[in-house]
Amino acid sequence: MTAKVKDHPPLWGFGTTKTFKIPIEHLDFKYIENCSDVKQLEKILCVLRSGEEGYYPELTEFCEKRLTGLAPRSRALRKDKPAATASSFSAEEWEKIDSDLKSWVSEIKREENTRHFHDPEKHPGVEDPLPPVRGSNSCPRGGKETSSKSKTAKKRIPRDYAEWDKFDVEKECSKIDEDYKEKTVINNKAHLSKIETKIDTAGLTEKEKNFLANREKGKGNEAFYSGDYEEAVMYYTRSLSALPTATAYNNRAQAEIKLQRWSSALEDCEKALELEPGNIKALLRRATTYKHQNKFLEAVDDLRKVLQAEPDNDLAKKTLSEVERELKNSEPASELQTKGKRMVIEEVENSGDEGGKGDEDDHEDDGVDMAAMGNIQKKLMVRSQGGRRSRRARTPMPGAEQQEGQPETGTASTSDNHDLEERRAADSPGDLKSRGNELFRGGQFAEAAVQYSGAIAQLEPTGSENADELSILYSNRAACYLKEGNCRGCIQDCDRALELQPFAVKPLLRRAMAYETLEQYRSAYVDYITVLKIDCRIQLASDSVNRITRILTELDGPKWRERLPPIPAVPASEPLRVWHPAAETPDQDPCPNSCTPTITDEKMFQALKEEGNQLVKDKNYKDAISKYNECLKINSKACAIYTNRALCYLKLGQFEEAKLDCDKALQIDSKNVKASYRLELAQKGLENCRERVADPSQVVLLSPDSSEAARHLDTKNDTAPPSRERERRRIEIQEVDDSSDEEPERPAEASAVEEGWSAERAGKIEVCKPRNAYEFGQVLSTISARKDEEACAQLLVFTAPQDLPVLLSNKLEGDMLLLIMQSLKSHLVAKDPSLVCKHLLYLSKAERFEMMLALTSKDQKEQMAQLFDDLSDAQADCLTAEDIQALRRQYVL
């Protein structure tokens, strides 16, 4: 038996190491000597070397020797060696190494000198033919030293505290942006002027020329994708100077088309077709140049060739349809041009035909959720501007269907500006809006904003007659500004759109995005919340609210809502008006005169109510009553106003007025919980308990969510005499948020009324048998707070002694222990000493008993000793002196 104990380690070990979890007993000479596991020895050696369990040099050395004997080539035996230096070698070895390095350096220099490309440092007179690396901050080589000197000469002096108080963040940021734009423009121009259009290819092989041409073409592609078409043209020219290819000509033609250099683009397309006849891209781009040069027949020929090769080419089909339409419209114009007469476009006013009507879609912003926003169909009704044009006015001029700003050919080219002004004057707001929508969809936001501005300028004098149309135009122009990054212009247009059409969703969303871009998160939060009030299904607004909530919590802390601007109240009819518009009839007025006062009264009512609620929160009850009085003048059937005013009367002690308001509220809504509860408080304040209309039990039955009524019901039951046979029925009360139409209830709203009867509530505690540990803990905590020894003794009588450790759980405190001992001594020792003995026995088995016993003072232990003395004096058949003495030892007395 003893041998087995020696072979096996004891049950209680000394733990393990942090690394490898090796038992501490294995870090021993005897174990290492007998161990033949190489992996185990390597782990032990690693732990010993780390020193996490202490430093034992002799044990470490012994482990190394043991591991050397078992595995001489083990990795654990390897030791780190520092990098070799000159002192690590002999003089001969170091001289040989040094000579080898020098010979290698000289050989590399000779190899560089034999290369074809010259070294600019050795030949300063010869310029480097290769362009510099592309970048916004590239500058001449000669200016590097001067710039570095100027930078080192400047010293930045830190600002003092008084200057920081006057620091305007937005102004400084705008200055930085302006400086950055100016520097960027200057650097780009300087960079373009330094790029040479030709590459010296003398002496290069075809492979090297191909490599240089592809490299320059790649640079041109990068410049083209970034929108720098001038730079792209230069790099494509450099590529063509190295090796002419059809691809480079095609690419340069596309860049020239972007720059509207039609003749240069046409030449490049023809050269590409000379190198590769039938090239699809060259034919397409030559057709584009023909189209803009009004050579429609040539464009049709090229496009038909493309469609013969690729019948499914969508771009060719679309361009061909446009060219055919232009060709068809230009036929009468060509006849008129032969006569040499100019047709003046005039607009006929006061015509019976409303030719200016146009059904256009309000374009969508990319940031708006498509499913939630949708295209809102609006009819742009142009009054006194649209009319029937004469047949002469309907006859289009040459190139009338072209894009704005394109030059026209033929006899009309002598006065292009005059024609452009006439054409713009003839365009109706509907045409301008539709053209702006097309430009917006094509990504030309600045041009779209110009079109919307023209439509706004025509409709602005009409004022409120076209408020809806103006609101849409302002909203569209705001979307263009938002895309361009002009957030302040976007905010101004959205404000104007909301003045014309309050609570429109799109202006609110776009203004919120602009505020968020400017980091004005509080204003953005208010706009997003307003959008969600109108339509809670908009996912973009919901996600943005969650994101901005996290940002405001980090910035302002948990009280960030107090710093928000006031959130406007959305009328109940507003969502229906915005999202479900009725069928529009041009003959009817958009809003009759009779509806204006109703909307005004509703807004005024809501504003007065919110002001009153805010005054209640600020405890300014008299001013709140005046606000509620004004609300009742507008709407005398608002039940919430009566209950709110009753609350103010209760706070001011005017119980009679509060009772009258509650009666009126109950006449409107007989099941109103707050009115019933506040009527109860008013009647109790009047000491008229016999004439109560509603008691708290009825309130709880009406609304189980009313926490205050349930709490008052518990107080009432506590003060009532307890019934002997019937056990009380318990009601679960869960506290939830109140409705949004009234200000939230506060637990202290009846504090002024409850002061009068606080003495009645301080009666004896009714104790019943607890069902679980939670109820036992609640009752015992209440008894301990009141120091009620009689109630504690009654609770111990109801409690079985063997259940006491479970019911106490880990909630035993020092004052509870002393109260239990005192209640046993005062009320139970003389009546039932055996029950006291059992309670003392099981009390010693409760959690935290030993800790509480160690924390008791000397006086408290003397009181406990008196309990045991009384228990010894009591005569009980089941108690002996040995039992009481054993209990004394458990209580350390």
UniProtKB/Swiss-Prot annotation:
GTP binds at E630, C631, L632, K633, I634, N635, S636, K637. Keywords: Cytoplasm, Fertilization, GTP-binding, Hydrolase, Nucleotide-binding, Phosphoprotein, Repeat, TPR repeat. SMART domains: TPR (SM00028). Residues 403-415 have a biased composition (Polar residues). Pfam families: RPAP3_C, TPR_1, TPR_8. It is found in: Cytoplasm; Dynein axonemal particle. Testis and sperm. GO terms for molecular function: GTP binding; hydrolase activity. Residues 734-744 have a biased composition (Acidic residues). Antibodies against SPAG1 interfere with fertilization. This is Sperm-associated antigen 1. It comes from Rattus norvegicus (Rat).
